[in-house]
């Protein structure tokens, strides 16, 4: 089943229990969540090989992790009709979050290798999409900051209007 909306991914940073976290999520899913046909949340996680001291991604490892993400998302979407809603990076781990129709005993069976990383997974019922709404989605202040950053990016790409310096 194709997603009923055009994805709109963006990121923001937060702190949880004095730990730095980066969150990347599909902002557009908010207007459609929960999706009744996808009541199960599935997390796929990898331990980073070279995290920074603050637990976030090391620039040298980022390309490998982005490639792993592309592989995992494609597998989950094509094999399990999963809806990819976001990624959390913290404490030396990258965790991808999906919503699926039902829990399966081995959701990563047949997934392409993403060596040198080993995949871990968990799933649980989340019919109201509470994880997406209450954890992934930014609070009002972080959401306003994210939207402000987008506005500045648009203005920067468009160039400075005449008379404004």
Where is each model-derived feature located?
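Charge-rich, low-complexity segments
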Residues: 1-93, 99-107, 116-164
